Amino acid sequence: MSGNPVHPVNRVFVIGVGPGTADYLTPVARACIEGCDLLLGSPRLTRLFPQESRPLDFRGDPPASVKYILENRSRQKIGVLVSGDPGLYSFLGVISRYLPPEDYEVMPGISSVQLAFARLKESWADALILSLHGRQETDLARKVAAHPKVAILTDPSHPPQAIARALLAHGLKGREFIICQDLSYPEERIVRTTLEEAAQLPLSGSLLVIIQEKAP
């Protein structure tokens, strides 16, 4: 029989690494990572593990990291590390557009949203979850006004103070504004304040915001 040898294709693993420190990495996710030859992810995540790694690259169509996976998965077991849980605003959405379901596995993780509500000792079953991390939300004020509890993933381009100012500019008042900073890290801090006060706070770091109606 002639022709080139056929190499089996390794499944790609999309792995939720949790909200920050390795303390919140699940045992199943850790075992999956240990079985990978190469990890794709942000330096904040890949530096937690000894394997060879590459940063995620979203450029191009398909994105450069997807192209790398397609070209190398026959000879490498590749793990894609995402913060929190893969099902919540992660690179999983990109992977699912280019790979059939049988070609990848998803390892769930603990999201920063879960940890934030755990810290507050509140349910998040009724929360609307939005992300401004690397994206725009053109209808933010209407969505916040329509829901009694909203969690927002932020990034440096959309810090909590800018979110508070935008909501105030649309006339939204009377909401509690909770800033969860660097969750799971030693410097973790949670600030419960108002929209008006939050608009003046100079904050940076890994931040999540929860906006909810004040208790009567």
Model-derived segments and spans:
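A short acidic, often aromatic-flanked loop/helix-cap motif at beta-alpha or helix-coil junctions
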Residues: 60-67, 112, 135-138, 184-187
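A contiguous loop/helix-start segment that scaffolds small-molecule binding in enzyme catalytic cores
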Residues: 10-14, 27, 78, 146-216
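Class I S-adenosyl-L-methionine
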Residues: 1-107, 114-115, 198, 207
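Class I SAM-dependent methyltransferase SAM-binding "motif I" and its flanking Rossmann-like core
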Residues: 87-148, 192, 196, 200, ...
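Generic secondary-structure signature for well-ordered alpha-helical cores
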Residues: 38-41, 74, 122, 168-173, ...
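Short, conserved loop/helix-junction motifs that constitute active-site signature segments
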Residues: 32-35, 99, 144, 168-173
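Short gly/pro/ser/thr-enriched loop/turn and capping motifs at secondary-structure boundaries
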Residues: 46-48, 111-115, 159-160, 184-187
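Alpha-helix N-cap/loop-to-helix initiation residues
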Residues: 22, 88, 137, 159-160
